[in-house]
Amino acid sequence: INEEEISLKDGILHHQENVDLLPANIELSALEVTMGNVMSREMIMKEYIDAIRSRYDYILIDCMPSLGMMTINALVSSDSVLIPVQAAYLPVKGLQQLIKTILTVKKRLNRKLAIEGILLTMVDFRTNYARDIASRVHTTYGSQIEVFENVIPMSVKAAETSAEGKSIYMHCPKGKVAEAYKNLTQEVLKNEK
């Protein structure tokens, strides 16, 4: 942003499960304001991602639930987007605006951007509410955008992983969330072919 050269290794953490992470920190929250006057501000992340792309099979960018400049940067940097949405009223309500933003980025900034699909998360199918939300997502978006068959269930074990600094596969490898992520990965890879 300030034209300083950034080392391609700066901030990357190597995890024992053969995954590299570039975690966000508190300074990232001020970045949105700083980016306001930067030329080609939508392309900042793309420059970095393009520089490291050849080192990885896949690069996943996990964005905050916001349509700010960091999310726009992530969309410009990406080949495709998987839209996670909690099985609750307010997140589903914001889905239309997110899809509109994705399509605008595709039209103006990243023509190759594709929507992989919508992933329902924090789903508790024991409740009528979650079943209703899932049904509403399928009805509203299913004809235009794939809604993944696999969903990520509500689970305390999933919430515990952040505090422990472990993946769900190390924390609770035989649990329903680990199984759901494994199945989702297979579904996404199958769709890629």
Please identify what each model-predicted range represents.
Residues 1-193:
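P-loop NTP-binding core
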